[in-house]
From Swiss-Prot:
The gene is bioF. The modification N6-(pyridoxal phosphate)lysine is found at K236. This is 8-amino-7-oxononanoate synthase. Belongs to the class-II pyridoxal-phosphate-dependent aminotransferase family. BioF subfamily. Catalyzes the decarboxylative condensation of pimeloyl-[acyl-carrier protein] and L-alanine to produce 8-amino-7-oxononanoate (AON), [acyl-carrier protein], and carbon dioxide. InterPro entries: Aminotrans_II_pyridoxalP_BS, Aminotransferase_I/II_large, AON_synthase_class-II, AONS_Archaea/Proteobacteria, AONS_Proteobacteria, PyrdxlP-dep_Trfase, PyrdxlP-dep_Trfase_major, PyrdxlP-dep_Trfase_small. Transmembrane segments: none annotated. It comes from Escherichia coli O139:H28 (strain E24377A / ETEC). Its cofactor is pyridoxal 5'-phosphate. GO terms for biological process: biotin biosynthetic process.
Length: 384
């Protein structure tokens, strides 16, 4: 089979399963409204949970940062790309979340891959929740260590896997809020079992940071858990992009020496770091509390209105509210019908989610209003 035949066969298989991913160019897509092909839609596919992507103070901070530092960092942080803006953001994140150090990464995917690649050796073992993000599972699969997966949020299964002999160290990996189901991990129980077996805990809290807990400190703070490795991302609650790893000083020093994604990547622009500092300030003050409270009320309104629909509603109290349809083609058809009626909703299909669980992944944000939720419910009931 030639290269072209191999590529064609893979694409044909995706098409046959109604699983071919497509991109849609949008003129505006992060806020309450999405604009595409000169039409405006209510946007229920954005991860901008607090509605900060268009916040005037954050936009102004980025503009002022670009005027001061330029539009790029100019290099790796180990060469010339680590600015006083990066340093200030790291210090503010560490203070906010109660860690000694924070290290910035260009994306959450890069942060997860970097930590696992740098930390794990052949004699070690990763024990990951089966529904962990692709970046975590791919990094674990590519690492020299053994990968074992425990049933989703099943602490008993986790304990059984940790109890089996391991010549090296064990790292337990999970998420705070799961990206496709929107449910939360029982972090306190997971940490207790992990500590009983002398392991370390790594939590990816991409969908909890900024959105839940006191001052938006996220899932771990809410559950009074402090994992050895905490990954936070800035493309969701912060409304920007990028990520950070929170850890001890010695682990930070270690990652600065051995995390290749840090050493060999251009740093995020300093202007972006300035925007993130402004976003963090909003998240921490009363305005952040008000946005989180509004989001909670929107979620409650939505969940109360979908109980009698013929779909499976995931057990989620987060901004991620999946309606599980099951069949790929049915999910695609339903998403298209909703778009035709002015609601931009995305159908998520295997391999992103398990076979037979194709869904509409609805996301609610503080930028929405109650009438937006009511319109979404009206359209869903009309097509249920």
């Amino acid at each position: 089979m030639s290269w072209q035949e191999k590529i064609n066969a893979a694409l044909d298989a995706r098409r046959a399963a109604d699983a071919l991913r497509r991109r849609y160019p949008v003129a505006q897509g992060a806020g309450r409204w999405l604009v595409a092909d000169d039409r405006q839609y209510l946007n229920f596919s954005s991860n901008d949970y607090l509605g900060l992507s268009h916040h005037p103070q954050i936009i102004r901070a980025w503009q002022q940062g670009a005027e001061q530092f330029g539009v790029g960092s100019g290099g790796s942080g180990h060469v010339s790309g680590y600015s006083v803006a990066h340093q200030a953001l790291e210090e503010e994140l560490a203070e906010w979340l109660g860690y000694s150090r924070a290290l910035l990464f260009i994306s959450g995917f890069a942060a997860n891959q970097a930590v696992i690649a740098a930390m794990m050796a052949k004699e070690d073992r990763i024990v990951a929740d089966r529904l962990s993000h692709a970046s975590l599972l791919e990094a674990a699969s590519l690492s020299p260590s053994q990968l074992r997966r425990f049933a989703h949020n099943d602490v008993t299964h986790l304990a059984r896997l940790l109890a089996s002999p391991c010549p090296g160290q064990q790292l337990v990996v999970t998420e705070g809020v799961f990206s496709m189901d929107g449910d939360s991990a029982p972090l306190a129980e997971i940490q207790q079992v992990t500590q009983q077996h002398n392991g370390w805990l790594m939590v990816d809290d991409a969908h909890g940071t900024g959105v839940i807990g006191e001052q938006g400190r996220g899932s771990c703070w809410l559950q009074k858990v402090k994992p050895e490795l905490l990954v936070v991302t800035f493309g969701k609650g912060f409304g920007v992009s990028g990520a950070a790893v929170l850890c001890s000083s010695t682990v930070a020093d270690y990652l600065l020496q051995f995390a290749r994604h840090l050493i060999y990547s251009t740093s995020m622009p300093p202007a972006q770091a300035q925007a993130l500092r402004a976003s963090l300030a909003v998240i921490r003050r009363d305005e952040g509390d008000a946005r989180r409270e509004k989001l909670v009320s929107l979620i409650a309104r939505f969940r109360a209105g979908v109980q009698d629909l013929p779909f499976t509603l995931a057990d989620s109290c987060s901004a991620i509210q999946p309606l599980i349809v099951g069949d790929n083609s049915r999910a695609l058809q339903l998403a298209e019908k909703l778009r035709q009626q002015g609601c931009w909703v995305t159908a998520i299909r295997p391999p992103t989610v398990p076979a037979g669980t194709a869904r509409l992944r609805l996301t609610l944000t503080a930028a929405h209003e109650m009438q937006d939720i009511d319109r979404l419910l009206e359209v869903l009931h009309g097509n249920g």
